Structures are given as C-alpha cells and as structure tokens.
Amino acid sequence: LYSRVDCWQGDEISFKYKNKNIVKKIKTRKSMRKFLLLGIILSAATLLSAQTKEDVIYNPIITGVPSLSISPDAVGGAMGDVGVASKPTLASQFWNSSKYAMMDSKGGLTLSYTPWLRKIVNDVDLVYLAGYYNISEQFGTLSASLRYFSLGNITLRDYNGTELGNAKPYEMSFDLGYSRRLAEYFSMGVALRFVASELNAKTEGYYTGIGFAADVNGYYSRPIEVSSGTSRLGLGFNISNIGSKISYNKGVSSNFMPTNLGIGASYLFPFDAYNRIALNVDLNKLMVPSRRSKYATGFNQSDPATWAMSDKQYSEISVVKGIFTSFSDAPGGFSEELKEISVSTGLEYAYNEQFFVRAGYHGEHIEKGNRQFFSAGAGFKWTAFTLDVGYLIGVSQNNPLDQTLRFTLSFDMDGLKDLMD
C-alpha cells in the first residue's frame, strides 16, 4: 500500500501511497511518527537508524510482513538475536524448530511480550506464544506458535492535514511444526505458517493481505568430553518463510515474504559442575531479490534505464526464481551481496542451570538497514518456570531500537509434574 518512504528528516516526514488513479500525500508532524513506522514496516521491511550520511546510498531489501523477522523472545534477543544453533529453548519455533526434537522434557509453553520501538511510539507491541509436545522418539515432536504484532492506533490525514479517521494495523501469523531426530546427534524439522497483514487504512481497493509460508531446518548437537565435564558443539540451519507473495489489492501488486537463510554455530563449555558458558554465532541473509533502482549502488545518472526496474518487472519475478537469484542480483555485485549478510554473536553464562546472564551484538551493514545494537539480559529458573528479560542498546545515537525490552515467561511440563508430585 505504501510504495515508498520519500523523506525522513526528524519529525517532518512525508510519503506517498497509490491507489489506481488516486495519489495522496500524507504530511504531518507528531502523529506522523507512527506513519513513519507503518511505512517502514509495510514497504521498507527494515528499521533504519536515523543516520544521515551523504556518502551512503541506502538499498535495503524490500519485503512484505517484515514483522516476521523480529526476534520475539528475551533469550535470543538478549544475545544479539542468535538462536539457529544455540541451546534449544521453548521459543525454538522461531529460530529453528528442529531443536525441539533434542529437548529432554515432554513439552512446554512460552509467552513473550515486547513493547516495540518505545523510543518512538508507546503503543506498538509484539506478543508471541509458542510451545511443543514430544510424542515419542519414534513419532517425533509437534510444535506451534502464534505471533501478533500491533502497530497501535494511527490517525490518518491527507496532505492538507484533514483527518481521515483512525486505523489499527496489525500483522499476525500462526504456524504448526513437526521435528524428528534422524540420528543420535541430528534432527530436522518443518513448519507451515499462515500469515495475515491488516493495514486498516480505509482505502478503497485494498484488503487484508493473506499468505502462506514454510520453514525447513536442521540441528546438529554433539557432546564432547573435556576435563571439566561435557561440552557441546551445535550447528544449525533454518530457511524460513518460504512461501507465497502477499498482496493487499488482490494481486495487482505484491510483496515477497521475508524468506531468510540462517546458519549458526554454538559451543557450550562447562567450567565445573555448576558453571558453564555458551558462545553463539549466527549469519543471516534474506533470500529475496534485490531491486535495481536509482537509489541502488552503481546507479548511472546519465543512463537511468540501466538500473531502473519497474514495479511490474519486479512483481513478475517468481518466488523460486527470487530465492536463487538473491545470491547474485545485487546491483553492486558480489561486494554488495556480502553486505546483505547480518552477523549476530551471543554469550550466555549459567550457574547450575538456574541463573543466566547474557550479552550479544547484532551487526547489519548501513546500506542494508543499519540495525546495529548491543544486547544484554538475565534469566531465572525455578522448578517448572523460567523468567527471562532482554534489553537492546543501540550503537548509533538515534537508533529507534535503543532501549527495547523483551520479557519471556516459560514453563516446562516435566518440571510442572515434579512440582505437583
């Protein structure tokens, strides 16, 4: 619906959206902060730090339903957004659902809440509910999750400042997963996802965006005996959100899902019977075609047609073709492809598997979104229940992700059973 963010300069922001022959321009000040967020969420699919450098040409990859890429839980979020190969948690449905098959408990449930972008707005929230049940080693493990991302209440205005009403846009998804241990140290999983994106913009000709997607993932976890106990090496991959495009106007135009390739490695090392640390590293790359435009690296001002790609041409790229070409279609060549890879590193210290302290860093190239932040967090486990908290610290001065908090409450079925006995 919102085809382009035209301007981002402090509080004064304007952008255009098109509806067939209708072109409206929305421009205001205070209330436009939410419109900025909506424009980014729906069209840019990435949250840019408010840095203005004349020598930087921003070329983020555009997707629909970008909230699917927001890490929902306080454990992975406190470690720089890692989770592809880290120790399995109850929120593994988002990171790598095949990890559920490696969990010792019969099942569990987790609820996470994130007041998102509190530095900009006060009513944007992400709620995430996930759980799993281990049927048996022979029949595998079932898992599910529900995600709801609310963009709060937004006042719609035309470019004259006249109010057009209020909107309450949201994005949500529901998915079911199955995972199974295929070997002593290796498991695989799949998840099927239903996605709905409601703009609530009260514009004729636009509807709720509906889409379907799937995840395919694997996890390798091998114990290694060391002098202080048993360490563990973890390796994993997750190809997430492989699926249909999403459209708000019944196919007239459509956006790619945020299909993502994530690979990770982890190493858990025990100092003694009570103390251990875990080191985690994830690499992520969107498997979505780059869009060549005058804003892209390498644009030749004297020959705009060289890099220009019309909306129609881009929308005609199939999902399968887009996945494979996403590794070689960046306008800036191989060097720009490398810029599309984000890096997450995380460290976790645990005492007696009851007290946890976490820290991490997430880095994304400035041309591809500039989401750069440090993170920290802590957790406490008491029998069946675990409470985790995560906190983000933006690298840049005006990073909208700065001061973001995450809260996660989890309970374990085996622990709950022991508590009842």
Q: What do these predicted regions represent?
A:
Residues 51-421:
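Subset of outer-membrane beta-barrel
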